[in-house]
Amino acid sequence: MNNNLPTDAIAAAVAVLHKECVIAYPTEAVFGVGCDPDSETAVNRLLELKQRPVEKGLILIAANFEQLKPYIDDSMLTDTQREAIFACWPGPVTFVFPAPATTPRWLTGRFDSLAVRVTDHPLVVSLCQAYGKPLVSTSANLTGLPPCRTVEEVRAQFGADFPVVEGETGGRLNPSEIRDALTGELFRQG
C-alpha cells in the first residue's frame, strides 16, 4: 500500500482546509471526513453534512501528541496511565481526555471531555503535519448509509466534486477502539 501523498495533493487538501471546508481522506479502517477543529464554520459544515447533532461531540485525529495538547487536559494522568496510552499510539485507539474550558463546545458537545487519536496512517500523518494541527475526524457516510471504504464510495455518497484525498484505508475491519484515558474503560470495541 502506497499512501505517500504527493506534495501537490497535500497542498491542495491544506488549501481546502484553510477555506473552512470539509475534506474526505482514508484512515485506518474507513474514509473519514474532517475539517479544521478551530473553525466553528468548518465544524458546522461537517455537522450539517453528516446530519450529526453538535451535542454528540467529535474526535480529533493527529500526527502526534503535541498537536492534541491544546485541546485536552492531561495533567491528571499518572505515569502508568500515560504509558498505557502511548503504548497504543500511534494507532487505531481513541482516548477520551478531560477537556479544558478553552476547548470549543463545537468539539466537545455536551461533554467536558474530548476524544482524540494519534494516527498511524501515513497519509493522515502527512496531512496533519502539513496543516500543522489535528483534524476533526468522523466516518465518511451520510446518515443511514455504511461508512465509505473507497474513493468511489465517498464520491457516490457526497458527490463527484467533494474534495477527497485519494489513498487506501489501512485495511482494518472495525473503526477505532474508544477508551477513557483516566480509567481505561472501554466505550467502543475496535
Curated annotation (Swiss-Prot):
PROSITE patterns: YRDC (PS51163)
Keyword Transcription regulation attached: no
Gene Ontology terms, MF aspect: ATP binding; double-stranded RNA binding; L-threonylcarbamoyladenylate synthase; tRNA binding
Catalytically driven reaction(s): L-threonine + hydrogencarbonate + ATP = L-threonylcarbamoyladenylate + diphosphate + H2O
Keywords: ATP-binding, Cytoplasm, Nucleotide-binding, Nucleotidyltransferase, Transferase, tRNA processing
EC number annotated for this UniProt entry: 2.7.7.87
Family note: Belongs to the SUA5 family. TsaC subfamily.
Task performed by this protein: Required for the formation of a threonylcarbamoyl group on adenosine at position 37 (t(6)A37) in tRNAs that read codons beginning with adenine. Catalyzes the conversion of L-threonine, HCO(3)(-)/CO(2) and ATP to give threonylcarbamoyl-AMP (TC-AMP) as the acyladenylate intermediate, with the release of diphosphate.
Protein name: Threonylcarbamoyl-AMP synthase
Organism of derivation: Citrobacter koseri (strain ATCC BAA-895 / CDC 4225-83 / SGSC4696)
